[in-house]
Amino acid sequence: MTFAIFCYLWNGEKIVPADVRGSGYLYIGSVRYSLDSAKPAFESAPFAMGRIGRLGEEYDTRYFLNDHLGSVRTIVNQNGVVTVEYDYMPYGMQHKNSSLATSDANEFRYNGKEFLSRFCVDLYDSQARLQGMNARFNSIDPLAGDTPHVSPYVYCAGNPIFRIDPTGLASETPYHYNWETGQYEDANGHGVVWGTVWYYLKPSAN
């Protein structure tokens, strides 16, 4: 049996995921440190287009290309070469067409969330809860009382193609109307045309 240990601050912020030997990561804000050596060593940190991380004694910059749900679809290295491509089933399972190399160490994938396979659990870290690839969270929604008509375990109200749940507390749509700018924007605040929004809002032909 394999055990994973997760440590959190009082406000629910994760600071350490590790195995029973203490091998894992230390989080200070969004910066991740490796605990695989005698003392914590810088591992990676996010920036606008991806992550910069340590590869041995060198630093490797990787650019993440995301889809409308924030899922990482392609990773490009600092030389502009595509190193890996991801395709997902609706609830985050890796599609067989993905060019996932065995040497690929990236753990930020579906919806941009950290995949915890290193700790022998096929779950995504959704901050407030851990999310499986079977359309369910592994624990009840702390805000379940706000949506009594929805199962407290279901992911994105059963609609993972259109909705996202970045915190594990409440699902939301990837597009919203900004009343100050008078346009629709994606989750990153970038303007999108109405046709893009309508594509995801239009009723199904079935």
Descriptions of predicted regions:
Residues 1, 6, 10-24, 29-31, ...:
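Conserved catalytic cores of ATP-dependent inositol ring kinases
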Residues 23-25, 35-36, 49-53, 82-83, ...:
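A short local loop/turn or secondary-structure capping micro-motif enriched for an aromatic residue
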